[in-house]
Amino acid sequence: MGTLLWPRPATTAFAPPIAAGPSAAHVVAGGGVKGRPRRVSLALRCPDPRPRVIQEGRGRRTASRSYVAAGGAAAAGAGDSSRVLPDLQMVSRIRGVFFYMVTSAAAIVLFIAMVVVHPLVLLFDRYRRRAQHYIAKIWATLAISMFYKLEFEGMENLPPNTSPAVYVANHQSFLDIYTLLTLGRCFKFISKTSIFMIPIIGWAMYLLGVIPLRRMDSRSQLDCLKRCVDLVKRGASVFFFPEGTRSKDGKLGVFKRGAFSVAAKTGVPVIPITLLGTGKLMPPGMEGNLNSGSVKVIIHRPVEGDNAEKLCSNARSVIADTLLLHGYGVH
């Protein structure tokens, strides 16, 4: 017979919460590789003016999961509350396969359109590239509309395409880019250089004017910031994920100052955007799966000023407060 494992009784009514260790965002923002400090403003943290709040879960666990192991094998350890059941996981994988099939098919057709119009774009609209961004919006909308619902709030806070700005948002998932492209704004993303090597997608990014960045390379970071400043001065907008990477646990990480130094130097507003739900649909590390659900995009009022540290702090506070309001965590 199998062995029934019963959890060891705790010495107190409720076990004390375990303090969370430093997140990947803290490590990247604070020390770079092996503790080496970065030398450019892109890697500098911005302070959080709000007092640190320790949040408790919405509910307390009243029982522990027990596992029955057949054939005398024992299964130990607590179950992960975010684990997807096998049947639901299979459905998510199938949805993921169809999502990439639709995305790839649409990308091939629309990439041809981008190539056709590119000479005219370089001639008449080299910096904003509105025609290319319009095609990208169609592509993202086609890819998304069949798989998850989008809800927008605060669209009136978006400046017109003719007004340059620095956009910033929290980063939860691979789906963030698709979602943001549906806004139809001509902002230039910053992406790892390796992504440009992906057929069709990488080539389309080049046509859109996406800015390449070699991570852990201080010279590349400095060149990236200089290019962003130049683009903004020429009337284009830029988009940053100030955390520098996707959140592994869904909590908002530390912001770096690079985006806000660009805004401070050029005098353009910062447009904070909060993304809700993308990390649940396609969590980091599970890019082959696509869960069902919806995504909400909240565009906040512009933040203006000439002090990069204050811009960073104010923009992060707006996004952090919104995430907390909707039940998300903040580091």
Residue ranges and their predicted role:
Residues 1-50:
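N-terminal chloroplast transit peptides
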Residues 2-17, 50-86, 90, 222-331:
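Non-catalytic C-terminal accessory region of glycerolipid acyltransferases
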Residues 150-151, 212, 238, 270:
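Hydrophobic beta-strand scaffold residues
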Residues 143-145, 205, 231, 263:
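A generic structural signal for well-ordered alpha-helical segments
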Residues 64-165:
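Membrane-anchoring hydrophobic helices of lipid-metabolizing enzymes
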Residues 156, 193, 214, 274, ...:
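Residues at the C-termini of beta-strands that transition into short coil/loop
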Residues 111-137, 145-146, 160-218:
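Catalytic core of membrane glycerolipid acyltransferases/transacylases, capturing the structured
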